[in-house]
């Protein structure tokens, strides 16, 4: 109650211009976050499902209790080519929707076969001075105490935008076991 009274007294002391500027900034922040939420929800609802094979997981991240560092096998090919950042990786999907590396491209309009997709990747700096490539998310957060379920994760399930200006954008849905079933 006391803080509410102080808050109202501070608002009364503010000029109308200051109040407008603060309100406009708050509105811009809310619009920014709202736009990003809508964009990510669109990727999840309209994106095409792809499974990316995971490289062996760093066990230290499991010991922290609530997240797992993800490294996708497809990124091994990008490392080998010393690729630029924020470009596209062409992958071919097998019958189980598992992605296999084909090539790299700078062109979002490149002609693709029916079973191929573009995945947007980015080059990130490591905390230890190195670099790594990411596709979608590079970590998976889960409820504390449930780490044992995710030790057997073999694939990351992602949704990928296949057309428009966001082509190749990926959102992580969850992790799958060796049978390609989503771990819940």
Feature locations, PLM:
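Generic structural detector for well-ordered beta-strands
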Residues: 51-53, 92, 159
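Extracytoplasmic/periplasmic terminal helices and flexible tails
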Residues: 102-103, 112-184
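Short, Lys/Arg-enriched N-terminal segments with co-localized hydrophobic residues
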Residues: 1-13
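Structured domain cores in non-transmembrane regions
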Residues: 75-118
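Hydrophobic membrane-insertion alpha-helices, especially the h-region
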Residues: 19-36
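Alpha-helical transmembrane signal-anchor/signal-peptide segments
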Residues: 41-56
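Short extracytoplasmic
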Residues: 53-82
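Extracytoplasmic
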Residues: 47-49, 67-69, 84-88, 153-155
